[in-house]
UniProtKB/Swiss-Prot annotation:
This is ATP-dependent 6-phosphofructokinase. NCBIfam families: PFKA_ATP, PRK03202.1. The keyword Disulfide bond does not apply. The lineage of its organism: Bacteria, Pseudomonadati, Pseudomonadota, Gammaproteobacteria, Pasteurellales. Pathway: Carbohydrate degradation; glycolysis; D-glyceraldehyde 3-phosphate and glycerone phosphate from D-glucose: step 3/4. It catalyses: beta-D-fructose 6-phosphate + ATP = beta-D-fructose 1,6-bisphosphate + ADP + H(+). Homotetramer. Catalyzes the phosphorylation of D-fructose 6-phosphate to fructose 1,6-bisphosphate by ATP, the first committing step of glycolysis. Allosterically activated by ADP and other diphosphonucleosides, and allosterically inhibited by phosphoenolpyruvate.
């Protein structure tokens, strides 16, 4: 029989994402409504290792649902890969008699929760908090929709100036090795060309396509590309030399992570926060939460990381390509 849960801690780890505060708020208030004690860990796994644990109450999470970032703070802490570091983290949790941990973050954060579950049998629930939308077991991650809105707004503005100056604009969008954000932003922003990790970069094909469109009377172009695929400034120089059109690269960068979360992310994060507490109350641990076909679901976090694969959004890519 699972141990009764009386105290829960929550942390945010890795890159911040709009909606993390809403998720923290959901966990905190749901826990308090169940009569549980709730703690916050500042600065992610780094803070857990360094005993940065604070008690939380309802007022701790007042007026944060609309705020971007994470009021608990976040940090990347690669040292957590060391089992001795994880042992110390478990000792800190035991010091406060914390029975379970809710981790909000991306795949690196999930890996930390997986190891705590796998090695120590410690009850962890993972909530997908990343703008990259690259987490298995969920259609959407917390922060993705807000980042998409930010990217589309940037593309809209670039289209105005690109059209006016007959310019080629290259827009680098976050996502690491996942093209979801780029594909959706390209479709919503009407980009002429889409380059994502799942399909690769074929410069010759890109040049041929741009040349063909210019011959047909096209006077400008917007290229959406996922980060880390190439040096976009070098690509801009190559295209300008090839076509004689002014070509500029814009790296959206961390602006995509900031800003007030959109309603979708606030709702998703709040629902997931409540759901995480419900799962712990039901005796579940070692799970990761997702939303699939509009329904909240949970998966074994070890199985999810080891065996599940994130499907490529082929239908959206094809639609964006056909409409380019």
């Amino acid at each position: 029989m699972a141990k009764e849960i009386k105290k829960i801690a929550v942390l945010t780890s890795g890159g911040d994402a709009p909606g993390m505060n809403a998720a923290i708020r959901g966990v905190v208030r749901a826990a308090l409504n169940e009569g549980l004690e709730i703690f916050g860990v500042q600065d992610g796994y780094y803070g857990l290792y360094h005993d940065k644990v604070i008690p939380l109450d309802r007022r701790s999470v007042s007026e944060i649902i609309n705020r971007g970032g994470t009021f608990l703070g976040s940090a990347r802490f690669p040292q957590f890969k060391d089992i001795e570091v994880r042992k110390q983290a478990v000792k800190i949790l035991a010091k406060y008699e914390i029975d379970a941990l809710v981790v909000i973050g991306g795949d690196g954060s999930y890996m930390g929760a997986k190891l705590l579950t796998e090695e120590f049998g410690y009850p962890c629930i993972g909530l997908p908090g990343t703008i990259d939308n690259d987490i298995v077991g969920t259609d959407y991650t917390i922060g993705y929709q807000t980042a998409l809105q930010t990217a589309v707004e940037a593309i809209d503005r670039l289209r105005d100036t690109s059209t006016s100056h007959q310019r080629i604009s290259i827009v680098e969008i976050m996502g690491r090795h996942c093209g979801d954000l780029t594909i959706s932003a390209a479709l919503a922003g009407g980009c002429e060309y889409i380059i994502v990790p799942e399909k690769g970069l074929d410069k010759e094909s890109l040049i041929h396509s741009i040349a063909d469109n210019f011959r047909k009377g096209k006077r400008h172009a917007i290229i959406a590309i996922t980060e880390l695929m190439t040096d976009v400034h070098q690509l801009a120089r190559e295209l300008e030399e090839k076509f004689g059109h002014e070509t500029r690269a814009t790296v959206l960068g961390h602006i995509q992570r900031g800003g007030s979360p959109c309603p979708f992310d606030r709702i998703l994060a709040s629902r997931m926060g409540v759901y995480a507490v419900d799962l712990l109350r039901q005796g579940f641990g070692g799970r990761c939460v997702g939303i699939q076909n509009e329904h909240l679901v949970h998966h074994d976090i070890i199985d999810a990381i080891n065996n599940m694969r994130r499907p490529f959004k082929q239908d959206i890519f094809e639609a964006a390509s056909k409409l380019a």
